Amino acid sequence: MPHFLAKLDSKPLEYPLIRGDFCFHREFLSLKHPTKSCVHASFKNDVFLLQKIRRAGDFLIKSEKATPLKREILKQALRIYSQSFEVISHNLQENSKHASQKKALDLETFEDFIQKNQAPILIEIGFGSGRHLIELAKNNPTTTCLGIEIHTPSIAQALKQIELLDLKNLHILQGDGRLVLESMPNHRCEKIFVHFPVPWNEKKHRRVLSEKFLNEALRVLKPRGFLELRTDDSLCFEDSLKLALKNFQCEIEIKKNAQIPVVSKYEARWNKLKKDIYDLKIYSLGLDENPTQNHALDFSFDTITIDKESVGAILKTPKIIKEGYFVHVCNIYENKGDFLVELSMGDFDWPVRLFVLLAENQVFYLNKSPLKTLNNHKAHLLLQNILSQKELDERDHRSE
């Protein structure tokens, strides 16, 4: 991670510090850990935070992961900020020109990606080695393709192939495919592929394909678009088939041991062992003219008045756990009566770290809002109650 170390006796800074397109607005001091602070900064329209940690013999100054920037811009920001200190050491050298420039999307940048790509897209969830995904993109050069994966080595391997093959229509997102679909607008997918997911026969609630997932898939698929499940696990196939048969929004197509043009490494292994492979293709009929979607969920805050006394009570709030979501106030930072609240919150499947700024009678998420899912919205409403102290007044701190 880009950072630098500075001497403790470095001169105090005067804010705001403006250098070109960079502005370091002010420094918020932690009310929980006196050795920590956050520097509120911006580059053009991008807002970010720097962490400043006082140690035994130096300051450590680095990026705050909850407010990400492109790596080279972040390094430039730290290089500029370091000019106001007596630097002991750093790792802020410019990257090699030969370094890979292709990066994975994340859940925080996904909404921007969807807004820029209005045409229906092809999605593969859990692409593993990436063989099927790469061929999908090669065979559909004018269609935007998206691979969703949580396994970092698989993502790195796919990104390398994308760069080598110059596949400009293929993008990779690191995240939970269930949450990605839930946050998407209606009728934005042409096809969704789920090939050889972990069957989770002993923990079925962890499966990708559930009743909720199927409903979301049918919502985001355009009419006659399809979700394709390919699996070697008969129980997983049978349970998925039962889910599809109960849903009146779709029609299904079943195949067994079908030959397909692209065979994954996993499938090739089972073919050698003569193991059965099942295909379940679920077509969206598009019967629901106004399907419910989460894309319009409101993550703004009502007006909140806060002072040091109420901040102390909020900071002492224990983690509040509800069914499927939670809110944890991790820390609060202060600067002349304005407050920066550090949070861990949201859906249990993919919790996020966020910062909320309370300044000049305004309350808003700094840098990014939570992904627009139902559980994240419930967590947002709970946070609204915590900050306005409604949840504190009700004494609802018990874990459910």
Curated annotation (Swiss-Prot):
| Record-listed substrate binding positions | D232
Query: Which InterPro entries did the record assign?
Result: SAM-dependent_MTases_sf, tRNA_(Gua-N-7)_MeTrfase_Trmb, tRNA_methyltr_TrmB_bact
Q: Does the keyword Methyltransferase apply?
A: yes
GO: which molecular function terms? tRNA (guanine(46)-N7)-methyltransferase activity
Q: Name the UniProt key words of this record, in alphabetical order.
A: Methyltransferase, S-adenosyl-L-methionine, Transferase, tRNA processing
Which domain of life does this protein belong to?
Bacteria
At the top of the EC hierarchy, this enzyme's class is transferase
Q: Give the organism's phylogenetic lineage.
A: Bacteria, Pseudomonadati, Campylobacterota, Epsilonproteobacteria, Campylobacterales
State the protein's name: tRNA (guanine-N(7)-)-methyltransferase
Q: Which family does it belong to?
A: Belongs to the class I-like SAM-binding methyltransferase superfamily. TrmB family.
> NCBIfam families per the record?
PRK14121.1, tRNA (guanosine(46)-N7)-methyltransferase TrmB
Task: Tell me the leader sequence span.
Answer: none
Biological role: Catalyzes the formation of N(7)-methylguanine at position 46 (m7G46) in tRNA.
EC number(s) for this protein? 2.1.1.33
Write the gene name.
trmB
Which residues form each disulfide bond in the chain? Answer: none
